[in-house]
Regions:
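Fe(II)/2-oxoglutarate
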Residues: 1-77
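Non-heme Fe(II) oxygenase catalytic core, chiefly the N-lobe of the double-stranded beta-helix
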Residues: 2-12, 68-79, 88-230
């Protein structure tokens, strides 16, 4: 017990510290509509928001803070994910960005400069690393329009606070391509179990709190298309 009477937690953790029963119990928790009153609906335990409704209150600081507080709570103690319909209002921008990115993929494949996908054999899938910079160089005006989105900064600030930094990658998993292995996209998400043993327990959640991952669907993505599984 610590001074406050709470059970003491170990400083060092390893694989034996993790119990599958705890994980199963966590993922089986349902999402209560009362915990996400601003969501338009809940699908597969995921709160879904209407981008138009959020944009309608952009000038209302109190309403926006309420949305951000709800999202932060979802990330911290809820299902860990929020989804948006109509996050973008200019779908032609999405289509144009897609065309530019496809061109970048083709150019990098021809020149063998793309770097490839670290989950599959060379050439099986396609990656565009540092896609933001490459899009900006290829079409600065399109880059600006693509990033003139009100929702992405709000969601990012809800978890990371102000002055966050954005990095983007494109990942194309082709039919027959090897699926990604299970991982967490943050500083400690790709290290081996042996390496992770050198970090005290309190650093693990801190590292996760410093990163937020989002995805923008550029096309219809049914399950058959192999979207990222959460």
């Amino acid at each position: 017990m610590d001074r406050m009477g709470a059970p003491s937690e170990p400083v060092w953790i390893d694989q034996e510290s993790c119990r599958l029963e705890d994980f199963s119990r966590a993922v089986e928790v349902d999402t209560d509509a009362g915990d996400v009153p601003l969501a338009d609906e809940i699908i597969s335990k995921i709160p879904v928001y209407d981008g138009d409704r959020v944009r309608a209150v952009l000038d209302d600081a109190g309403a926006i803070r309420a949305y951000m507080a709800e999202w932060a709570t979802v990330f911290r103690t809820g299902p860990g994910i929020v989804a948006f319909r109509r996050a973008f209002t200019e779908l032609d921008v999405i289509d144009r960005v897609t065309e530019v990115l496809i061109g970048i993929i083709a150019d990098e494949a021809e020149s063998a400069t793309g770097g490839g996908d670290h989950f599959a054999a060379a050439g099986a899938n396609s990656r565009v690393w540092n896609a933001h910079e490459k899009l900006c160089v290829a079409d600065p005006e399109l880059f600006a329009r693509y990033n003139a989105n009100d929702l992405i900064p709000l969601v990012s600030r809800s978890w990371l606070g102000a002055l966050f930094q954005v990095t983007t990658q494109v990942n194309v998993v082709r039919p027959g391509g090897k699926a990604q292995t299970c991982h967490r996209d943050y500083h400690m998400g790709f290290q081996t179990s042996q390496q992770l043993k050198d970090y005290p327990a309190h650093i693990h959640p801190v590292s996760a709190a410093l990163t937020l991952q989002g995805a923008i669907a550029h096309c219809d993505m049914p399950l058959e298309s192999g979207p990222t599984k959460l």
